[in-house]
Amino acid sequence: MMASRMKRKFHVRFRAGENLEITSKDYLSLYLYRNYGAIAKDYYGYHVSVIDLRNPLFSDGNNMLHLVNKYMDFYKQGRHNLSLKAKTEKYAKIIAKTIIFSDGESASNYGQNSFFYDSAEGLLTSVILIISEFCPARQRHIVSVFKLVQDLLKPSKIKGKSSFQVMMDLLPDNHKAKWFAGSALNTGEQAMMSVLSTILSRLNAFIDSEIEQILCFETAVDIEKFCAEKSAIFLVMPEEDNTKHFLISLFIQQYYREMLAYADEQGGRLKNKVIMYLDEIGTIPAIQSAEMIFSASRSRNISIVAIIQSLAQLEKNYGKEGASIIMDNCQDTLFGGFAPNSETAKVMSENLGYKTVLSGSVSKGKNDPSQSLQMIQRPLMTTDELKSMPKGNFILMKTGKNPMKTKLRLYKKWGIELSGEYKMRMRNHREVEYASMYEIESILKSKNQNIDNIMQHIDFQSIKRGGVKVE
């Protein structure tokens, strides 16, 4: 579906007040966010965020740790509120799972190595919580997580202990960051180093001086704001640079998991409908549990519009069975504009079904003319008929309805005029600050020293005389 076909639908969505998440390759994104970002913001009151991986200096920010930091700050203001602490841990676990299993696999698929991936997920959760709790605001981002994990691989000054073990010893015994790292902490040194190396291999893809301008600062529209208010997020994918494609897949996974977490707080269903337009979903790296996403999203008031060029793209990413599950969970299928050698046209012809037609033959002889008629079955539209449909003609298949042949007109023929562009201003290059293991250790030692000083000034004998049991 090209940009001109999507424009009319976006106007309807804007009027309905539905939230939109749109990912597209570069040339299509120029039409979408430049034209429809302005319309959404100026005429319908939408919050608009553009995550442009092609031009990071013209992009809004998207700090993956934003919600963790947000609830960590709230929790620090009132430590008695355990629900805030639970939210911090929940969003940290979402980020860790998304990064460790970003290739679409699950721990069970790694066989004997599943321990390392499960441990890596727990340890990454732990490091995220430590960064969020003990680092200054400008250092709380995903690249700091990489930097800290790298520092933890260094040998420590204490004989027989790694830097990782030394830092964990400085945390209180009941600190959840220490618990999340438990499986890695209580294993052999070689296995521990393997777990840390597994995390580094996953985080290595974030090391990019330009992309840091997106990942290391503020977030324009977080998922809670996105779900609660009218919002549109545009993800721009540079088709010529496949090293950044994984970020699109990663953002989609994180957004979806955070939307589910938010929906659970709202009774299991989002109050505002969310539409995810995923252009080129067949060319970005596989989205973990995509089959489940397509199966379960509708019950959470989330609709997914998957836009592909060929069914073979889905099969390549998700396998034949996974592609079949995704297709089976699509209530509407719109297709047209097939290439002359398209195999997808053959599949779509079969999906349309068959009709019964009258067929026969007539033969004439001198004395015995004969006529033969019979009812036969033929495809509703053959592969050749689908391939030869005029430009702008499409077939719509909808659950519970007969297939429909329709013409989708250009947006101009609907009377839609695009008056202005949504322009992103160029941001100045900002210096990125990173977390330091030594600074975090210094903070932890200072906190422990303060606790020791307080304990020394408590008169336990007076407390005992007051009838309070002290252990």
Q: What positions do the PLM features span?
A:
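Cationic, low-complexity basic patches in intrinsically disordered or flexible, solvent-exposed regions
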Residues: R8-F10
